[in-house]
Amino acid sequence: MREWAVAVGGAAAVLAIGAITPTAALASLVREWDVFAFLLGLFVIVAIAEQSGIVDRLTVFAWCHAGGRRDRLLVLVSAVAALVTVTLSNDATVLILTPLVIALCRALAVPVLPYAFACVLMANAASLVLPVANPANVIVLHDAPVRLGSYLAIAALPSAAAIVATVAALLFVFRADLRGGLADPPAAPGDPDTTIVAVGIGAIMLAYLAALAVGWPVGAVAVSGAVLLVAARTARGHLDAGRFARGIEWAVLPFLAGLFVLVSAAERAGLGPVVAGALAEAEGAGALGTAGLALAAAAGSNAMNNLPFALVAGEGLRAAPGAGAPTVVALLVGIDLGPSFTTVGSLATLIWILILRKRGIPLTALTYLRIAFLPALAALAAAVLALATVSALAAH
């Protein structure tokens, strides 16, 4: 991942020209400690989950229950992708599930792209379900704390609409590839710690929900859970240290640090009040403004990638502390679902493209757009309409 060098280089440049002082840059990083802790803990949890074979079992489960039908298999792979996204994050879905799906498709001589696209598009669509399902959500909510109950009340319908619309659109787009049957699935690889790790991840999810409900930092939960999983795996003598270290996306941390410094410099130049003004206008326009804000966030996420856009949105929310939960969720609808339109819209999509290329599946940006456009549009439109409906009902 070379993007980290661009972000760090940009941060060095704004420091060199005096757009931000070293003290202010360091303060911006310390202020976001919860985001860094969450990501580090998440990457460790994902690496442990990959070693333990949990997702392998889920993938083979989908194959076993597809009834020999490719379309049913697509629905089940989408369901597995949604489950992995909600429990581990959208980045985990593309990192762990995509390689397994590609390998299984090749073993069974079925087209790869329908199921590979189910991984990446569902990773984005399902990441709206919970605040911890997407690192971008954590970034935004760090600057605009929304209680879990309020978040779920507003995001539940848009999330469900996006997931259903994505699956329906995938079935339509790949209808020609989904004709035909399936061979017998391969056996899932065995691992003595699968159950232990699965229970551990379930406990971490409950701890996430508890932390969100009372306003505690989720980064502390992620790091604590990661330490316990590593300790359990090590104590049983089943930790492959080399594979574990390689499975962590270390480059994301300097990438994010560089972005924090860049956005902090932009804030000092007056970005925060500008974004805050736009948020206030959207809130004043009711349900229509909420829908427009989601679409604007989707456009911004594709223009600059959703992580830096999440940082920009966070700066705006910090400058507008009175922003309500509907406004915050509207931003996240665009930030989570909008990136599905392009190959550069989200970190998950960038990782997914690299995984395909490493496995001999070159995919141009134009080909991606041609395939993903309808599912992405369906998901975003369904979520925006659902959000507008929820906002209108709440206003009355």
Sequence positions of predicted segments:
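Interfacial loop-to-helix junctions that mark the boundaries of transmembrane helices
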Residues: M1, A24-V35, L148-P158, G190-D193, ...
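Membrane-interface alpha-helices at helix entry/exit sites of multi-pass transporters
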Residues: G68-L76, R106-C119, V146-L157, P321-V333, ...
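Alpha-helical transmembrane segments and, especially, the helix-loop junctions at the ends
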Residues: T85-L95, V112-V146, T166-L171, A298-L311, ...
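Juxtamembrane and boundary regions of transmembrane helices in multi-pass small-molecule transporters
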Residues: V110, G149-P192, V214, L337-H396
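Hydrophobic mid-bilayer segments of alpha-helices in multi-pass membrane transport proteins
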Residues: M1-I20, E32-V44, V197-M205, G215-T234, ...
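Membrane-embedded alpha-helical segments and adjacent helix-loop junctions characteristic
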Residues: L26-L113, V252, L256-G322
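Long, contiguous bundles of hydrophobic transmembrane helices that form the permeation core
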Residues: I163-D240
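Hydrophobic alpha-helical transmembrane segments in multi-pass integral membrane proteins
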Residues: P135, M205-L212, G258-G277, A382-A388
